[in-house]
Amino acid sequence: MLDSFDKGWFVLQTYSGYENKVKENLLQRAQTYNMLDNILRVEIPTQTVNVEKNGQTKEIEENRFPGYVLVEMVMTDEAWFVVRNTPNVTGFVGSHGNRSKPTPLLEEEIRAILLSMGQTIDVFDTNIKEGDVVQIIDGAFMGQEGRVVEIENNKVKLMLNMFGSETVAEVELYQIAEL
């Protein structure tokens, strides 16, 4: 269960097509209800896609997860109430009903989403160090275990055992998890 003052990233479910309005309303409500210390950041993951129309290709931004908005917040009762009662928010993902508080995203999940958006992210505290055995949780080597041989600037070199021989692979820090 989440302590009443844990900070984390949470996923809001919204009516599809209302993501920008929810972001706008939520930021306004955070200011109105004096919650700017609790409701820290609101993001709508987008991606650039090429659309061909009338023989012309055009780049457009589209929502990566239609009907969902990410919010970084300190989960107090008051902040939960303000967010939950924002117009066009239908609920929190990971909330198990009965007015229970939701489960935050895992650090690796939010890191991957923000990096895919080209966002700068805070450096996350990690206990991973050279010599540790870790599991790759994202990318081409997902599911493999490897030994950390070097960590530099959020890049990690791992020694993997593939096809009976050891191979060095370089992955991003967000792509691995401690075992």
UniProtKB/Swiss-Prot annotation:
Keyword Hydrolase: no
Superkingdom of the source species: Bacteria
InterPro entries documented for this protein: KOW (IPR005824), NGN (IPR047050), NGN-like_dom (IPR006645), NGN_dom_sf (IPR036735), NusG-like (IPR043425), Rib_uL2_dom2 (IPR014722), Transcrpt_antiterm_NusG (IPR001062), Translation_prot_SH3-like_sf (IPR008991)
NCBIfam families: nusG
Protein's UniProt name: Transcription termination/antitermination protein NusG
SMART domains assigned to the protein according to its UniProt record, in alphabetical order: KOW (SM00739), NGN (SM00738)
Role played: Participates in transcription elongation, termination and antitermination.
